A protein has these predicted regions:
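Zn-dependent metallo-beta-lactamase
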Residues: 1-21, 28-31, 97, 104, ...
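Short active-site oxyanion
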Residues: 4, 64-69, 133-135
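Active-site neighborhood of phospho(di)ester-bond hydrolases with catalytic His/Asp-centered motifs
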Residues: 23-26, 43-51, 71-74, 135-139, ...
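Binuclear metal-ion centers of metallo-dependent hydrolases, dominated by the metallo-beta-lactamase
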Residues: 69, 81-94, 174, 178-226
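Active-site-proximal loop/helix segments of hydrolase catalytic cores
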Residues: 113-179
Length: 226
């Protein structure tokens, strides 16, 4: 069965597969490029890579409305639990087999603090195995050589930031593709703010010229079936 992915802008994706609906980093309210409002999305699980407002976003409000389980690092799980929400906490390198598939937390070189400035735990990326397909959502990170180890899992889809300034930019993202060797790449985390303006088509051309991967540039609201 295919995994259906919908890009909602910035780093946010909705995924349907394994009999569940997942939402990753739901920064919708306050996102000038968001394809939907927080009231329009559904979720059984909400994955939060770190506590910055442009990733934690509407996670709490959506979970309160839908009853979704929040999945993230231990500190984010405690934060969600303190608000009466169901949460599953992990740490980097740890994984868990959920009814729909497996989630494993990967390294991400970034920061993490809640909107009030309190410590948000270590940021992470997500390695998802759903319907037998391996999806790597790098979330906010700089380039790191251990991406090669992630690639050894056999990655069908890599979702990589290209915005620069807060994350790796297009040149380092291209190097990441060469380390991971995925089948398909989708660039994210660009154009939301002036400081991360990029041309994703330039990145796509470089990926397809220098690697075997196919690069898919999705506009907010567009979908892809894996």
């Amino acid at each position: 069965m295919p995994v259906e992915l919908t890009y909602y802008g910035h780093a946010c994706f909705g995924l349907k597969g394994g009999g569940a609906t997942l939402l990753i980093d739901p920064f919708l309210t306050g996102n000038p490029l968001a394809a939907v409002s927080a009231d329009e999305v559904e979720a059984d699980y909400i994955l939060v890579s770190h506590a910055h407002g442009d990733h934690l976003g509407d996670a709490v409000a959506i979970a309160q409305r839908t009853g979704a389980t929040i999945v993230g690092n231990h500190e984010i799980a405690i934060y969600a639990g303190n608000q009466g929400l169901t949460a599953h906490g992990l740490h980097i390198g740890g994984g868990w087999d959920f009814p729909f598939g497996r989630i494993k937390l990967t390294i991400a070189h970034h920061g993490s603090s809640f909107p009030d400035g309190s410590y948000g735990g270590n940021p992470c990326g997500f390695l998802l195995t759903i319907e037998g397909k391996n999806i790597y959502h790098a979330c906010d990170t700089g380039l790191f050589y251990d991406m090669k180890l992630i690639g050894e899992e056999g990655i069908e889809l890599a979702i990589l930031p290209i915005g620069d300034n807060y994350t790796m930019g297009p040149k380092d993202a291209l190097r990441a593709v060469k380390l991971i060797e995925p089948t398909v790449v989708i660039p994210i985390h660009y154009d939301t703010f002036d400081v991360i303006k990029q041309d994703p088509t330039d990145f796509a051309r470089a990926v397809e010229a220098e690697t075997k991967a196919r690069c898919l540039v999705l506009k907010p609201g567009e979908s892809y079936s894996l």
